[in-house]
């Protein structure tokens, strides 16, 4: 089952600076090292990683990876009639089973990203390296938590691996 499993990790703004930005809060481990550790721990899982400082990119990725109907099926119009589902191409062996999402600052501000997460057909696990409930007042509100399948906060970069483990267990 794991060999066909694909998990997408999506990071938001400033997470490209992980390991260098505010190490007293976010630690010294780079995202590259986090990804190496995750792949080492789960060699049979296919991981895809995306990071952007732009809100629209995050929304596009959550939609494209999170909508099973878009990922797993093709739609084909026949003679101008309504679209009909057809089988996936035989080369499409990996199906997205979950999304690990650290939306960074957009966690607290983006209704549009929240709406995209709410539309997903795969579980989205929200991850925050620091404990946002113990940070500044403006960081204590997550617009995403109630539309995510699970939330992991304050576990440092280990939270990413915990999120992967949650998705794997959820798909057993």
Describe each model-derived feature in a short phrase.
Residues 45-56:
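Short beta->alpha junction loops
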Residues 94-136:
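Mid-chain, well-packed structural core segment of small domains
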Residues 153-172:
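A charged, well-structured terminal subsegment
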């Amino acid at each position: 089952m794991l060999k066909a499993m694909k998990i997408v990790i999506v990071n938001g703004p400033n997470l490209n600076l992980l390991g260098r930005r505010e190490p007293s809060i976010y630690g010294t481990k780079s995202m590259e090292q986090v990804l190496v550790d995750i792949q080492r721990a789960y060699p049979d899982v296919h991981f895809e990683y995306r990071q952007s400082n732009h809100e629209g990119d995050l929304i596009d990725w959550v939609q494209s990876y999170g909508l099973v109907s878009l990922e797993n099926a093709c739609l084909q119009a026949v003679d101008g009639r309504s679209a009909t589902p057809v089988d996936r191409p035989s080369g499409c062996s990996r199906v997205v089973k979950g999304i690990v999402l650290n939306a960074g600052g957009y966690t607290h501000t983006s209704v549009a990203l929240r709406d995209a997460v709410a539309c997903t057909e795969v579980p989205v696990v929200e991850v925050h390296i620091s404990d946002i409930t113990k940070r500044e007042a403006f960081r204590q509100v997550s617009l995403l938590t109630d539309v995510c399948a699970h939330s992991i906060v304050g576990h440092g970069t280990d939270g990413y691996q915990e999120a992967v483990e949650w998705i794997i267990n959820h798909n057993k």
